[in-house]
Amino acid sequence: MCIRDRKKEINGVYLGADRYLIGVNDPEEYTEQMEDSRIASLKKLVNRWDAKVMLVPTADNILTDKLPAFAPHYDEMRLLAKVKESVGEEHYIDVYSALQEHAGEPIYYRTDHHWTSLGAYYGFLAWADNMGKFPYPYNTAGMKTVSEDFQGTLQSRINVAWTKDRIQYFPETEKKPVSVTYDFADTADSLYAPEYLETKNQYGFFLNDNHAFIEIHTGYNPGKTLFVIKDSYANSMIPLLAAHYETIYVVDLRYFNGKLFQLMEQYEPEQGMDVLVLYDCIHFLEDFKFY
């Protein structure tokens, strides 16, 4: 076990203030060449599909007051400025500002690298604002708690007794029946998988964890279709988007081995579809690649 007392770091995790565990994102690991390569691919997708882009900052860039003194972290604000300049302001969803405004609220888990349902809600509002949509009126005061003993990926890495997180969701997302198909085979009638709450991977509660391809049919907005290219940050926000679309297709490029544009053309309806790229900044750099 590597422990650096000055930075309060264990195995790539900062031991932050207020019991926050924050993943270490070393600035030296994310080169300008890597940034430019990912942004070039993103611009190609945006130009072809008129896509919207939401790259979510990780906790180290928003909860800076929780970081140990002098702890280095990758500057995602600089990356986001490059992305915005490349894809154009109309395609760029500024979730950074939305999260920064609510940094004093529990928008990230303390023991996991994801944002919470509250964080995803603020992302949803930023998306609606960019799209010119009146957002479905979810009630943050009415969020339902399904677990109070979640210990996420960062907790697993430090292997030290720490704190426990609460997992919540918006019960309004269950107001209408849905039909969900995972990986062209398995079907479900919910956007949630409560069986994951009995496992170590409790975040899998959202959208039944990660899958190469998900097809969602809702009782909302006939004729409206959304295609999402994403990492796991999207799993807790997609249920909030369901009230705005009849059909949502979701692809995770980490597990999908086919040709992305060919898949999108296959599922695009005659009237067209909205396209959303939704990643956290670090996984965008590490995983955003398609053929």
What are these regions, as identified by a protein language model?
Residues 1-291:
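Extracellular glycan-modifying ectodomains
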